[in-house]
């Protein structure tokens, strides 16, 4: 028997074939997908950034330049690209602003990673070095920052204005910024500044007027109008009752029905219904209630036509169909509990307020409650606008401004904007790289160069020469001008602090930390496995 020699290059039996190029290909695919997402929203960065028009499958159109909103509505399929969408969402939750910057920085860091991998540096070594870079960058930002106090209202307004200046509603920043500051300070509890809950600030959109007509209401605002045709539209010294039961005839459940065979039985049914509703209305009058807030019911009418007739007669103002999710906010504002049963509809469960009135705003009407006794720490903002698209973008912009003020309340320090902190970090990290040896030196230098993407993009979007602008910025910072940044309005490099372009320290530190963490996560992935389900 002749044994033939094994073919050259064949693997011994039992040993699996291993494709050494696969991890590199997967990593490259992930980097390319994430860079594509970053490049897609890069043009919307800064005050001179472009807006995006997003059209949903149902034909609904959104116009915005808010990074989180663009990415949330973008149809992203690649898992690595989805990581950048999640990164933007994480920045939105943590800081509320800087959602575009964080994705642009992550994209620049991934380009730096690509070059480092081509040099043959191991992904784990790059990941560890980037972690050190991130920590060093946060230290540099903290050193650059200026501490502020909550009593310094002017500084808070400046930061809110900077956030609004990059939005569609930038021309109204002088009107919206003080509203955002006032709202956050009103809901901030003494001693619990770190936990400012923006759910205590309710933003109501009202079609009609302009954004300049936006107002802060120290009380409650309902988008519903008062129900009664002949009922009161304005009630002074109001006694408010918030109920969760219906003022209408009870109905059988879905499995049962009532059959009426003759007119006498029909009369009895109507008579019973009238007596039932009249009893409820008498109890409401006896308690001294003159404003009734009724929760929406999915089973039957919250307030029947007959009930409205009786309530109009006793001059009770009725606001019905209050959504279930709004009840918590209403209770917190009125500092009361909802009345779930007629037996508990007593005078001591009512809330006193100076004024409840129905207000007209363009073509829409809403009910405003002011002067509430023992009011909870909540506030309402009525946003006005000429059309739905403007209203939605104004609400998003106002939310970002509220988040910026919340950041300053949580971490009371601010830094210059206009690309100044990024250039300062780049210069200091590059200088630190000179003191290092080996892989860390390469990685620190690459990280420093990547941070220059922010001033470069700001200059590009403002129609300036990015290379010349970044070079001049470097020179100014090298001469010790730490606050020199790009003034896009003047098209020049100026002292950004003197121009009042400031942002919270938390926005920048969060942006650097989250971007580097995401890049490190993408870097460490060497395979994508699809499951059966």
From Swiss-Prot:
UniProt key word Cytoplasm: yes
GO MF terms held by the record: ATP binding; ATP hydrolysis activity; ATP-dependent protein folding chaperone; unfolded protein binding
GO CC annotation, single: cytoplasm
Subunit structure, as described in the record: Heterooligomeric complex of about 850 to 900 kDa that forms two stacked rings, 12 to 16 nm in diameter.
Name of the protein described by the UniProt record: T-complex protein 1 subunit delta
Pfam family, one: Cpn60_TCP1
Localization: Cytoplasm
Originating organism: Ochlerotatus triseriatus
Record SUPFAM superfamilies: GroEL apical domain-like, GroEL equatorial domain-like, GroEL-intermediate domain like
